[in-house]
Amino acid sequence: MEQPKQKTVTGFSLFKSANTLVATPKSLDDLIKYIDFAKQRNFKIAIQGGGNSYSDVFFNDQLVIDTSHLNSIKSFDSENGQITVEPGVRIGDLLNVIMPQNWILVGLSGSVNDAIGGMLSTNVHGKDSWKNGNFSQNIISFKIMLADGTTKIVKNDTGSELFNSIVGGLGFLGLITEITLKLKHIPSYMVQHQIQRIPNLEKLVDFFYSLEENGLEYAHALLNPFVSGKNMGYKKALENTLSERLAKLPVLHSSHAYQSLFAYHQYKHIVTGHFAQS
């Protein structure tokens, strides 16, 4: 086990940083030793995956455990669409393995450098989350190491309080050591896409209503910072459109999805698509 090193850690935004000890385990034995290291010094532990969070969720001033070297793909069942990985595996590396076999994951974030453990711990959303849900929909089970060094297997059982507490729990309850994911079959890794201009929020909502009936699965809105007049303002739109119409969409049963659409209030162009036959 290497001694933790003093480093400055930053997130994707580079807006905040923290000067802290950083430990980089290369095995589960190393991980246990770093946990003991922290316990002996009464240190708090933060866990870093890909380091791509916009916020400071993996910052502290005592000890950060960097999981980037826990990056093995343990098994891949290409017939049944199931894969087991360590938490430091980057999504780009995983996609390079599964997509040539016509498999994909749902609820993927926009960066190929995100780590699977971090995606679980933040329950990231993607361009298809309006239809397929967030990253948690991929999870079959995972292993988590607790503060006493013991490991527990947590399954994605309906109504599981422990599962729901850990997924999206930002690493507060332990450190993910292994994740088993179910994969979604795709006809090919080619995507048919279209780009449309959306003048304002009301038209964007209309477009979201039409996504499924048009056979579209992915939607990504891009901000135009130069809009002005009625197309820029959002107060009236939020009071009228969001409260009356967005709440009726089935996808908006969760507050997270509601907030995602809320963020689109000044978006002007939207890219949509679906996987195509090769």
Feature roles, as predicted:
Residues 1-278:
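Noncatalytic alpha-helical scaffold of FAD-dependent oxidoreductases
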